């Protein structure tokens, strides 16, 4: 298989880095002083109370029975996987879907739930009227172990500008962030198409905008969903596995960037079309490599959620602030500059100034000798104030 489900243990390396990065952006200078005072402690207590209240609201949120689950051939396998979270005391799996228009986000929700709950636009003629659409389904299959578990899916509009087409819709992205503010996000599902050959500048701009809005740590709880994965024919010189691996490598490279930011970014291949092949043995929808994609997708989501101790909750302070992002480096940079100036630059400047002064003395002495040889008075050497005025006169000319 091109992308087999990854065990939850492989995500553990990112957990501590995720928490550290989120904490790094949480407190700006003013909040740091508040946290050291009684007022800051009270504010922190109020915020924690708000989080608890939000958790209770999420638990009481209206949900409908997951009727489409019984129509899915993969039902039993999906329930077994979801039961892993239920066994850990989790009552809900919340997934936020992000990506461009026409990559299959809404279709993926319909496929996952087994029912048409989200409107799908075949042709993108205008901007989405709804920025976010939330669907909550509750398991009710007569099994006490898993009944009551909720699956919450948050669909979002395309992140490209509907008018320009080649720029990021930052307004929509900000509205998405505000809509999910305070909502516990277990997994982010970043959707793109498999049947493309490159990551274009718009893709990179969208990825950067997501990082700036939600914080780079959001990618450590992201699963990449590549739709249109039923590729019957791949480009010449490639087979299915090599093409998938190449596409995955491009997307991961665009997200990870240079240096030390290396989120795992597991990948799930998706085929929402009704023409997707079906296994003659199990009845599961399978990809060209034989993988039952819906079961693999649910497994990736559960693995990612299980690897995180707490869900992600958006707050504006997590957004990238160029003036605050590396503020802790400012004292270090200033100290390094002062040390460099005192140890290296200042002695060399003083030495150079002394050489200039000695050269000027030598030139004026030589001029005096020449004028005495001619029987003239010694040259008039202007003082510093007169010399400065002469320089200004020449500069003005």
UniProtKB/Swiss-Prot annotation:
The protein's matches in SUPFAM superfamilies, at most eight in alphabetical order, are given as: P-loop containing nucleoside triphosphate hydrolases (SSF52540)
Q: Can you say where in the cell this protein is located?
A: Plastid, Chloroplast outer membrane
Provide the transmembrane region boundaries: 329-349
Tell me the InterPro entries matching this sequence: G_AIG1 (IPR006703), GIMA/IAN/Toc (IPR045058), P-loop_NTPase (IPR027417)
Which intervals of the chain are annotated as region G2? Answer: 126-130
Which cellular components does GO assign to this protein? chloroplast outer membrane
Please list the GO biological process terms of this entry. Answer: protein transport
Q: Which cofactor does it need?
A: Mg(2+)
Question: How does this chain sit within the bilayer?
Answer: Single-pass membrane protein
The protein here is known as Translocase of chloroplast 34 homolog, chloroplastic
Q: Specify the species.
A: Chlamydomonas reinhardtii
Q: Which gene encodes it?
A: TOC34
